[in-house]
């Protein structure tokens, strides 16, 4: 798949610059390559980060000519309600509220919202809103993302 090839191609450059490629999505019409990045040093991704990353990978993409024709390149931050793309992301966001959609239902549900309370191997434990817990195997997670909570809002705005 083209997205995977692009991600594989740009990841070494991203790592060298201190970034992690979260997602790559090439849309054919109109031709747009959207890349979502994060920083390894836990700092926020700023506009200057996106500009520097864009400039660096543009050269790599042009040399390899992996995308035929002209296209627009968009580089953006993962944002507050970011997707969790791998097990490392779940570890990084331990204690955060997330929403998960499952491949196979657990207790007749395929969608849960809860706080990541524990990770042991491939098993992720969520504290649910009804004060119960659920253990989910990482391979059973179809999609997961951070949920923007009132507590997160208070943390962001407390210095303003």
From Swiss-Prot:
Q: Which InterPro entries match?
A: Ribosome_maturation_RimP (IPR003728), RimP_C (IPR028998), RimP_C_sf (IPR036847), RimP_N (IPR028989), RimP_N_sf (IPR035956)
Known SUPFAM superfamilies for this protein?
A: YhbC-like, C-terminal domain (SSF74942), YhbC-like, N-terminal domain (SSF75420)
Record's GO cellular component terms: cytosol
BP terms from Gene Ontology = ribosomal small subunit assembly; translation
Gene name, please?
Answer: rimP
For this entry, the protein name equals Ribosome maturation factor RimP
Cell membrane: present as a keyword of the record? no
What subcellular locations does the record give? Cytoplasm
One Pfam family assigned to this protein is: RimP_N
CDD domains linked: YlxS_C
